[in-house]
Swiss-Prot record:
The keyword Cytoplasm does not apply. It comes from Mycolicibacterium smegmatis (strain ATCC 700084 / mc(2)155). Keywords: Cell membrane, Membrane, Transmembrane, Transmembrane helix. Belongs to the UPF0182 family. This is UPF0182 protein MSMEG_1959/MSMEI_1915.
Length: 1003
C-alpha cells in the first residue's frame, strides 16, 4: 500500500488571521518589550556614565555569539532532517490501517514547513540564547595573553589554561550537542519517512539512512577523542575529595592521564571502525567498536585508577603525593598572592618580662588602641548625628585613616549620613515627596577610633560617647567641615543605603524658579536645593519619560508637572553595583566605604579578577572563605563563587554626589586584567593616575585578606609530608564574643609598622590564627595599607602555648574584678553590657596584648534608642588582666606606673557628646534648649572644645630619661620584694615616686 495523500489544512478566514496576528504581536511585545526597554535604558545609563563602549561591546558580543550559534546549531539540525526527507524511500509499506508511524508521517507531511523549519529554528534559538551567556570565555580567548609561567606537568603557559582551554571546551561541547541533535533528528526523520523500518523479523535500514547515521555516530566518537585530549589538561585543576589538595595527584598522573591517552586511542580506533561501515555495509563492526569504547571507559577509565588509588597510593600516600603537594603549595601561593615577595614570616617570642617603660615606648601601638567598635557604635551615630527621621547610618560602620591635627596617622570610624527612603513617614511617602523632594543625604561623620568624649567612671555619669567630627551643610547653607579632612560637597545622592530600596530613583533638576529638594532647616524655614551634578539621565523629552514610566510602572512620569525639560533621573545608585555594571568582569568586595579625597566624598570599591581553573591551585568558595561574624550578622556575604586565582586588580571610586565611576589598575601585572583592558580599552586608568590623596585612603581589602588567611592556615607549610599530615596547620578562630556565631573578623588598626619593624605608625588589617583544632595562638597576620608598603603581609609565628582569642576572652570576662564590676553596671544600673571587638596587638618585645572595649547601653535591647557608650577597657597580657575606665588605667594595672604614659588621652566631656545637626534642630532624644528672649527656640549650643585625641608622638629627651628612671625604679622594687629586703623596697618605692613626678614635669 502506498502513502496516503496528505490532508490539507483548513483555510482560515481573514478575521481569524487578523486575530492571530494581533495575538502574536501581543505575545512578542510581552516577551520582548521589557527587554527592549531595559536595553534602551541601559544605553542611556552607560552613556551618561561615559562607559557606553562597555555596553555596546557586551551587546555586540552577545548578539554575534547568539546569531552564529543559533545559525550553526539550527543549520546542523535542519541538515539532519532535510537529508532524511530528501533521501526517503519512494515506496513505504505500512503495517496496516492502524500503523502509528503512518499517522505521524501524515501529520508531519501535512505540516512539513512547521516541523522541517520550526524545529531547527526553535533548537537554534535555544542554543543561541544559552551560548550568548558565555561571552566572557569568548572575549578572554580572543584577548588573553601569557602568564610567563608554565605548568609543571605539560610545560604549557598558564594563559592556555586561563584563556584557551575554557574556549576549546565550550566549542567542543557545542559541536557535540549539535552533532547529537543532528543524529537524533536524522534518526527520527528516517524512521518517520521510512528509511528505518522496525516491522518484520529483522527490520530494514535504507542505504541513505545507514550512511548518514554512521557518519554522525563516527563524528560523535571523534569529538569524544578530542574531549579525552582536553581532559588531560583539566586534570591539573581537578579537586577529587580523596586528595588533600587541588590538582593532579599520583593517581591522576600515573593512572588517569595514561588512561585518557589509551581511551583517546581506543576512540580513534572505534571511529575508524564506525566509518568502515560506510564501505563494508556491516553494522556489527561499528557496534563492536562502540561496545569496546564503553567497556574500556569502565575498565581503563575508572577501574584502573581505582585500583592504583586503593592499593598503591593509600598505603603510602604521604610519600606518593609529596611531589604533587609541593606543586600545589607553590601554585596556590602564587595564585593567591602569598609568595615570598609578598609574605614575610618572623618568629615572635617573648624573651623576657615586659616592663612599663617598654610598653610606653611602643607609642605607635599604645597611643592608637582602638576603642570604637564600628559594629556597635552605629546607634550612637544615629542618636547624636541623625538629625532627621529619614537620615540613616548602616548597622556596621567603616574604618579609615586620616592625618590628625597633630600630624600623626590616626584611624577613624567613618560613615555617610545617607537618605533612607524606607524611613519616610506619612505624607513623606507620597510619590512627589519620595522621588523629587527627599533625594539625598547630607554629611560625612567621623569619630577618632582611639578616644571617646569623657570618662564614665560611674555608670550614672555621662561620658564614653564617640567624639564626632561632622562635615555637613550648616544652617546658613555653607559647608561646615571640621575634619578629618576638608569637604566641599557633603550632599550624598549615591550610596549603599539610599539604593537599598525598590525603585530607588530620584528625579532632579530645576523646574521653574523654585528649588524642590529638601536640604536643611534654619530656625524659621526649610531650605531646598537643586542638584547641579553631571550625573543623571535626561528625561525632559517625552520618549524618555514614556520609557521610564514603563520601566518603573509609574504613570506620574507622564502626568506630573514636576518633570520639566531640565529634569534628570538618578537610578542604580549602589556604588558596588555601578562598578559591577561598568566592569562586568569584576567581583567586588562586600565592604564599600566612604572617604574624603581631594575635598570630594567618594565611595571606594575593591574589584577582583578571578579564575577557577588555575593548575594545582586550591579551589576556594568565596562565600565560605569570607564569612565571619560581621558578615553573618548583616547577611552581607560574598557570592557563592569558586575561585583558584584572585587579584585585587582594580580600585574603583564612585562619587557620592554625581555618581561618577572611575576605575584604576591596582595590579598592572595581572594577565587577567590585561586581557580585559584589551576587551574594553580606555575604561581602566593606569595605576599612575591614582593620586596621593586617593592612595592615602586605599585599604587592603577585607575579602581578599580573609581568603588569604584561610589559605595561609594550610599553605604556610613548606614540607609536603607535614602538609599531608596536617600536623602544623592553623585555624581561623571563632569570634569569642558571646553574641557572635561565626569566625572572628579581621580588624583595621593603626599600630606599629610590622613591615618596617620599627616604631612608626602603620594602617593595617590584622587577624590572629590558632593552632589546628586548638585554642592556642599560632600566628598573627598583618597586611599593610600604607602606600609605600601596600600589600605586604607579615606573619608573626608564635611558639609555645599562648592564649588564643577564645581563651583570652574567657580569662578577661571571668576575672573576678571584671565580672563583679560589670555585674554592678549591668544588673544594678539596668544597662546592657556589650563586649566590643577583641583586638590582638603585638607590643614591646615579643608580647601580645588583648584589648576588649566594654560598652553599656540603657535597657536590655538592641534598639537604636539604646545607644552604647564605652564604660570600661579590659586587657590581657600573658595571664594577667588589666581593667579600668581608660586605656591608661588598664595598662597601668597590667604593667605598672608609666605604662599608659603614651596611651590615648580622653577628650573632656560636658555632658553628652556634641550633636552636630545641619538643620539647627536638636535630635529627638535630646532635651529641647531653653527659649531665647524673643520666644524662639535657641540653637543647639556649640560643642565644647574637645582635646584632640593623642596619636603617636615623639617623646622628648627629658621624658625618655624619666622613662628610663621609671624602669630602673620598677626593677629595683621587684628585686627588693623578691629578696624580702623591705628597707630597700621602701627606698625603691620612693625612687619610683620621684621618677613619676619627674616624668609628669618633663616637657
Amino acid at each position: 500500500m502506498g502513502m496516503r495523500p496528505t490532508a490539507r489544512m483548513p483555510k482560515l478566514t481573514r478575521r481569524s488571521r487578523v486575530l492571530i496576528a494581533f495575538a502574536l504581536v501581543a505575545v512578542l511585545l510581552l516577551l520582548l518589550g521589557p527587554r527592549l526597554i531595559d536595553t534602551y535604558v541601559d544605553w542611556l545609563w552607560f552613556g551618561e556614565l561615559g562607559y557606553r563602549s562597555v555596553f555596546t561591546t557586551v551587546l555586540a558580543t552577545r548578539l554575534i555569539v547568539f546569531v552564529v550559534v543559533a545559525l550553526a546549531i539550527g543549520a546542523i539540525v535542519f541538515a539532519g532532517l532535510a537529508l532524511a526527507y530528501r533521501t526517503r524511500p519512494v515506496f513505504v509499506p505500512t503495517a496496516g490501517p492502524n500503523d502509528p508511524v503512518a499517522r505521524y508521517r501524515t501529520t508531519v507531511m501535512a505540516r512539513l514547513r512547521l516541523f522541517g523549519i520550526g524545529v531547527p529554528v526553535f533548537i537554534g534559538l535555544l542554543a543561541g540564547i544559552v551560548a550568548q551567556s558565555y561571552w566572557v570565555k569568548i572575549q578572554l580567548f580572543l584577548h588573553g595573553g601569557d602568564f610567563g609561567i608554565t605548568d609543571p606537568e605539560f610545560g604549557k603557559d598558564l594563559g592556555f589554561y586561563a584563556f584557551d582551554l575554557p574556549f576549546y571546551r565550550l566549542v567542543l561541547t557545542y559541536l557535540f550537542v549539535a552533532t547529537f541533535l543532528a543524529f537524533v533528528a536524522n534518526l527520527l526523520g528516517h524512521y518517520l519517512f521510512g528509511g528505518i523500518r522496525l516491522t518484520g523479523r529483522v527490520g530494514a535500514l535504507s542505504r541513505a539512512a545507514r550512511i548518514q547515521l554512521i557518519s554522525l555516530a563516527g563524528t560523535l566518537i571523534v569529538l569524544k577523542a578530542f574531549a579525552y585530549w582536553l581532559d588531560r589538561y583539566e586534570l591539573l585543576s581537578n579537586d577529587r575529595s580523596a586528595k588533600p589538595f587541588t590538582g593532579a595527584g599520583y593517581t591522576d598522573i600515573n593512572a588517569v592521564l595514561p588512561a585518557k591517552l589509551i581511551m583517546l586511542a581506543i576512540a580513534v580506533i572505534c571511529a575508524v571502525a564506525v566509518f568502515s561501515a560506510l564501505v563494508l555495509r556491516d553494522l556489527r563492526i561499528p557496534a563492536i567498536g562502540v561496545a569496546l569504547l564503553l567497556l574500556s571507559s569502565l575498565v581503563v577509565g575508572a577501574g584502573w585508577p581505582l585500583i592504583v588509588e586503593q592499593f598503591s597510593v593509600k598505603p603510602n600516600a604521604a610519600q606518593k603525593e609529596a611531589e604533587y603537594i609541593s606543586r600545589s603549595i607553590e601554585a596556590t601561593r602564587h595564585a593567591y598572592g602569598l609568595t615570598d615577595e609578598t609574605v614575610t614570616y618572623r618568629n615572635y617570642e617573648n624573651t623576657g618580662q615586659t616592663t612599663a617603660a617598654q610598653v610606653a615606648a611602643d607609642r605607635a601601638t599604645t597611643s592608637n588602641i582602638r576603642l570604637l567598635d564600628p559594629t556597635i557604635v552605629s546607634p550612637a551615630f544615629t542618636q547624636f548625628q541623625q538629625g532627621k527621621n529619614f537620615y540613616y547610618f548602616p548597622d556596621q560602620l567603616s574604618i579609615d585613616r586620616y592625618i590628625g591635627p597633630d600630624g600623626n596617622l590616626r584611624d577613624y570610624v567613618v560613615a555617610a549620613r545617607e537618605l533612607n527612603p524606607d524611613r519616610l513617614i506619612d505624607n513623606q511617602r507620597d510619590w512627589i515627596n519620595r522621588h523629587t523632594v527627599y533625594t539625598h543625604g547630607n554629611g560625612f561623620i567621623a569619630s577618632p577610633a582611639n578616644t571617646v568624649r569623657g570618662v564614665a567612671n560611674d555608670p550614672n555619669q555621662n561620658g564614653g560617647y564617640p567624639e564626632f567630627l561632622a562635615s555637613v551643610v550648616g544652617a546658613n547653607g555653607s559647608v561646615i567641615s571640621p575634619g578629618p579632612a576638608p569637604l566641599d560637597q557633603p550632599r550624598i545622592y549615591f550610596g549603599p543605603v539610599i539604593s537599598n530600596t525598590p525603585a530607588d530613583y530620584a528625579i532632579v533638576g530645576k523646574t521653574g524658579d523654585t528649588d524642590r529638594e529638601y536640604d536643611y532647616e534654619t530656625n524659621t524655614e526649610t531650605k531646598n536645593y537643586t542638584y547641579g551634578g553631571k550625573g543623571g539621565v535626561p528625561i525632559g523629552n517625552w520618549l524618555n519619560r514614556s520609557v521610564f514610566a514603563a520601566k518603573f510602572a509609574e504613570r506620574n512620569f507622564l502626568f506630573s508637572n514636576v518633570i520639566g525639560e531640565n529634569s534628570k533621573i538618578l537610578f542604580n545608585r549602589d556604588p558596588a553595583e555601578r562598578v559591577e555594571a561598568v566592569a562586568p568582569w569584576l567581583t567586588t568586595d562586600t565592604s564599600v566605604y566612604p572617604a574624603i579625597v581631594n575635598k570630594r566624598m567618594v565611595w571606594i570599591v575593591d574589584g577582583y579578577t578571578t579564575l577557577d581553573n588555575y593548575p594545582y591551585s586550591e579551589l576556594t568558595t568565596l562565600s565560605s572563605a569570607t564569612a565571619d561574624s560581621n558578615e553573618v550578622a548583616v547577611n552581607r556575604l560574598a557570592p557563592d563563587k569558586k575561585v583558584s586565582y584572585i587579584r585585587n586588580s582594580v580600585k574603583a571610586t564612585v562619587d557620592a554626589y554625581d555618581g561618577t565611576v572611575t576605575l584604576y589598575a591596582q595590579d598592572e601585572n595581572d594577565p587577567v586584567l590585561k586581557a580585559w583592558m584589551d576587551v574594553f580599552p580606555g575604561t581602566v586608568k593606569p595605576k599612575a593616575d591614582i593620586t596621593p590623596e586617593l592612595q592615602a585612603h586605599l585599604r587592603y581589602p577585607e575579602d581578599l585578606f580573609k581568603v588569604q588567611r584561610a589559605l595561609l592556615a594550610k599553605y604556610h607549610v613548606d614540607n609536603p609530608v607535614t602538609f599531608f599530615s596536617a600536623q602544623d596547620f592553623w585555624d581561623v578562630p571563632l569570634d569569642p564574643n558571646p553574641t557572635a556565631s561565626s569566625f572572628q573578623p579581621p580588624y583595621y588598626i593603626v599600630a606599629k609598622d610590622l613591615v618596617k619593624n620599627d616604631n612608626s605608625a602603620s594602617f593595617q588589617l590584622t587577624s590572629a590564627l590558632n593552632r589546628f583544632q586548638r585554642d592556642f595562638l599560632a600566628a598573627y597576620v598583618s597586611a599593610s595599607s600604607d602606600p609605600e608598603t601596600y600589600g605586604k603581609l607579615t606573619v608573626l609565628t608564635i611558639p609555645g602555648q599562648v592564649n588564643g582569642p577564645k581563651l583570652a576572652f574567657n580569662a578577661i570576662s571571668t576575672d573576678t574584678a571584671v565580672s563583679q564590676d560589670l555585674g554592678v553596671i549591668g544588673r544594678d544600673n539596668q544597662n546592657r553590657i556589650r563586649w566590643g571587638n577583641l583586638l590582638t596587638l603585638p607590643v614591646a618585645d615579643g608580647g601580645l596584648l588583648y584589648v576588649a572595649p566594654v560598652y553599656a547601653s540603657p535597657g536590655s535591647s538592641d534598639a537604636a534608642s539604646s545607644y552604647p557608650r564605652l564604660i570600661r577597657v579590659a586587657m590581657l597580657y600573658n595571664d594577667r588582666v588589666g581593667y579600668g575606665p581608660t586605656v591608661s588605667d588598664a595598662l597601668t594595672e597590667l604593667f605598672g606606673p608609666g605604662a599608659g604614659a603614651t596611651a590615648t588621652d580622653v577628650a573632656p566631656a560636658e555632658g553628652r557628646p556634641a550633636q552636630s545637626t545641619p538643620n539647627g534642630q536638636q535630635p529627638a532624644a535630646s532635651p529641647p534648649p531653653a527659649a531665647n528672649a524673643d520666644g524662639r527656640p535657641a540653637q543647639a549650643p556649640p560643642p565644647p572644645s574637645a582635646a584632640t585625641p593623642t596619636g603617636p608622638v615623639q617623646i622628648s629627651q627629658a621624658k625618655a630619661e624619666a622613662l628610663q628612671d621609671l624602669e630602673s625604679a620598677l626593677t629595683a622594687a621587684q628585686e627588693a620584694q623578691r629578696s624580702g629586703d623591705f628597707a630597700e623596697y621602701g627606698q625603691a618605692l620612693q625612687r619610683l615616686n620621684d621618677a613619676m613626678k619627674k616624668y609628669d614635669s618633663a616637657k
